[in-house]
Amino acid sequence: PTAYDIPARGTIAYQYFEVPTNFTEDKWIQAGEVRAGDRKHVHHVIVSVREPQPATPRPNVVSIRPILASAPGAAAAPATASAAPPAAAGGNAFSRAGDATLVNWAVGEDAPVFQRGLGKRIPKGSTLIFQVHYTTDGTPGTDRSKVGLVFSKETPRQEVRTGMIANPLFAIPPGVSDYQIDAEATFSEDVSVWSMHPHMHYRGKDMTYTAIYPDGRREIILRVPKFDFGWQTDYWLAKPLLLPKGSKLYVSAHYDNSTANRNNPDPTKTVRWGDQTWEEMMIGYFTYTVEGKAAPSSAQ
């Protein structure tokens, strides 16, 4: 993307940069790496693929349900259709929901390398969208972040996808030290989960991913007991976890908005969803493949 001048002070909204690929055929990605141009001021970069309008919309195999946050000790209630949309919660992280995540960068995150037979697709004519979160520190800067991609030499057997299980419907009261926020995904096809990536801000304490099988059996597949906002990473399973059709992936997170949290920007404030680091997010990213589905050809 073009260079961006970062002011010395102030709050900077997420910046979006569009980079046409000019690809005349579909490309498959075996690996990718984002390099921040100004690591003093770049908090994270998310590179997504915005493809031309497909002739046949891709079926959605993941259904996300946020669970309404509850007071400590109370039972969580499912969100309703009348609940406020994410934009009303103060953030725009969902505003590009039609784009497919390609590769991310934040401090602590490794560049993904997919095994042979797997890959992410960039359809011909697509545009790469760089979402960049800048922070200020009293000194100006200039950033021109970039992405490097390794193309597959052959069409993979399966397409790798990135999903996110998120809940923007919360308000963390001042002084609460163990506030719970939950969300879940339900799968309409057999899927294999390959990796997970918890995302919260400074009040985030821990996050747990639990697989719930169609027969009701539960299995904790990832627990991050001490979330570190300054070191975010992907957690890859030793082998992919098969979740049969009808399974759920349940994500539960806890937040500390008390004075005991040394990183708390302001324990006197009620905290809601928002892009900035003094606000909060609850996102459980995960990487998956759909079983029994071959990677789409260029003609699709």
What is the meaning of each model-derived region?
Residues P1-S192, P198-Q300:
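Beta-strand-centric surfaces of beta-sandwich/beta-rich domains
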